[in-house]
């Protein structure tokens, strides 16, 4: 059953009317309602606010990493474990083919349904998850296979156990090692890009965001609680924080914005997957013509240009 956000109520009503008309066998009404639905979708999604895009990034029906992996990879095989502590299901790693190209995909997985969400810790990786990602990234470098990172997390897990096992070290180690990989790397924010939890698999030659995704150092709710002592002001915080793909592209913090279907990735997963696959293929065609040592050097220069600072 489809889920709807507050600003999608008109779309929900038309969807329900279409179902009722189909049950009655009223083909003429179905045809008219489908045209009305297209108009309503176009109207609703034409001028989304930053807060509405945040809601879409968290939409319960939005495709997750495993959805895209299933849709874009052929002959996919999962790689488990960090070889030190355990296998963290919040991070998924697959080796397979994108078209005719070998590729490794490393993604953050939130989970669907209560049991799966709990098992995957709602997409909040533990340090062993990031260490698994790094282990697989090293394998990719060893066999000269490019990597696609799919970012979708509210943040790294802040629990006591995670801190005891070195959460900050695991994130820092990934930043250090991924910045110097001698293979082409692409990272795409497909939903939420939550702070260090996203950065830990977000160092890449190309960093892109889906149109309705967000990327920030803290959640808007957390920002509102700190600045105004009122989490309810998250809508205002979302606008101030500049978390959307277009905002980050205009500031030079990401390389590209990947357009979604008009009605959002959650209503057309297949089209969203095609958009991602096309972007990855195009990027790999460009990156594979660059010497791997030059790739690494360019990646480091890109990192050093981030932000603004003044030397003393």
UniProtKB/Swiss-Prot annotation:
<dbReference type="GO" id="GO:0005524">
    <property type="term" value="F:ATP binding"/>
</dbReference>
<dbReference type="Pfam" id="PF03255">
    <property type="entry name" value="ACCA"/>
</dbReference>
<keyword id="KW-0444">Lipid biosynthesis</keyword>
<dbReference type="InterPro" id="IPR029045">
    <property type="entry name" value="ClpP/crotonase-like_dom_sf"/>
</dbReference>
<comment type="subunit">
    <text>Acetyl-CoA carboxylase is a heterohexamer composed of biotin carboxyl carrier protein (AccB), biotin carboxylase (AccC) and two subunits each of ACCase subunit alpha (AccA) and ACCase subunit beta (AccD).</text>
</comment>
<dbReference type="GO" id="GO:0003989">
    <property type="term" value="F:acetyl-CoA carboxylase activity"/>
</dbReference>
<dbReference type="InterPro" id="IPR011763">
    <property type="entry name" value="COA_CT_C"/>
</dbReference>
<comment type="similarity">
    <text>Belongs to the AccA family.</text>
</comment>
<feature type="domain" description="CoA carboxyltransferase C-terminal">
    <location>
        <begin position="36"/>
        <end position="286"/>
    </location>
</feature>
<dbReference type="GO" id="GO:2001295">
    <property type="term" value="P:malonyl-CoA biosynthetic process"/>
</dbReference>
<dbReference type="GO" id="GO:0016743">
    <property type="term" value="F:carboxyl- or carbamoyltransferase activity"/>
</dbReference>
<dbReference type="GO" id="GO:0006633">
    <property type="term" value="P:fatty acid biosynthetic process"/>
</dbReference>
<keyword id="KW-0963">Cytoplasm</keyword>
<keyword id="KW-0276">Fatty acid metabolism</keyword>
<keyword id="KW-0547">Nucleotide-binding</keyword>
<dbReference type="GO" id="GO:0009317">
    <property type="term" value="C:acetyl-CoA carboxylase complex"/>
</dbReference>
<dbReference type="InterPro" id="IPR001095">
    <property type="entry name" value="Acetyl_CoA_COase_a_su"/>
</dbReference>
<keyword id="KW-0275">Fatty acid biosynthesis</keyword>
<protein>
    <recommendedName>
        <fullName>Acetyl-coenzyme A carboxylase carboxyl transferase subunit alpha</fullName>
        <ecNumber>2.1.3.15</ecNumber>
    </recommendedName>
</protein>
<comment type="function">
    <text>Component of the acetyl coenzyme A carboxylase (ACC) complex. First, biotin carboxylase catalyzes the carboxylation of biotin on its carrier protein (BCCP) and then the CO(2) group is transferred by the carboxyltransferase to acetyl-CoA to form malonyl-CoA.</text>
</comment>
<keyword id="KW-0443">Lipid metabolism</keyword>
<keyword id="KW-0808">Transferase</keyword>
<comment type="pathway">
    <text>Lipid metabolism; malonyl-CoA biosynthesis; malonyl-CoA from acetyl-CoA: step 1/1.</text>
</comment>
<keyword id="KW-0067">ATP-binding</keyword>
């Amino acid at each position: 059953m489809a889920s709807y956000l507050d600003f999608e109520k008109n779309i929900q009503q038309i969807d329900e009317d279409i179902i009722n008309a189909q049950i009655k066998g009223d083909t003429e009404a179905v045809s008219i309602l489908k045209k009305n639905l297209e108009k309503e979708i176009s109207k609703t999604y034409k001028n989304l606010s930053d807060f509405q895009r945040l809601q879409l990034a968290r939409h319960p029906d939005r495709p997750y990493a495993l959805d895209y992996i299933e849709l874009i990879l052929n002959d996919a095989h999962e790689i488990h474990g960090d070889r030190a502590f355990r296998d963290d299901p919040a991070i998924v790693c697959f080796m397979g083919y994108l078209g005719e190209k070998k590729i490794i995909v490393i993604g953050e997985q939130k989970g669907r349904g209560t049991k799966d969400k709990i098992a995957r810790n709602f997409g909040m990786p533990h340090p062993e998850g990031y260490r698994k990602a790094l282990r697989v990234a090293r394998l990719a470098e060893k066999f000269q296979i490019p990597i696609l990172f799919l970012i979708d997390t509210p943040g790294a897990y802040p629990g006591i156990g995670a801190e005891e096992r070195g959460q900050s070290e695991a994130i820092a180690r990934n930043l250090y090692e991924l910045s110097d990989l001698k293979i082409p790397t692409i990272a795409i924010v497909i939903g939420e890009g939550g702070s260090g939890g996203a950065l830990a698999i977000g160092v890449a030659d190309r960093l892109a965001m889906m149109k309705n995704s967000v990327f920030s150092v803290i959640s808007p709710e957390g920002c509102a609680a700190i600045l105004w002592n009122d989490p309810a002001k998250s809508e205002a915080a979302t606008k101030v924080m500049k978390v959307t793909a277009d905002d980050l592209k205009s500031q030079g913090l990401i390389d590209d914005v990947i357009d979604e279907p008009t009605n959002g990735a959650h209503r057309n997963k297949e089209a969203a997957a095609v958009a991602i696959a096309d972007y990855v293929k195009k990027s790999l065609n460009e990156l594979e013509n660059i010497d791997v040592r030059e790739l690494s050097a360019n990646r480091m220069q890109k990192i050093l240009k981030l932000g603004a600072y003044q030397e003393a």
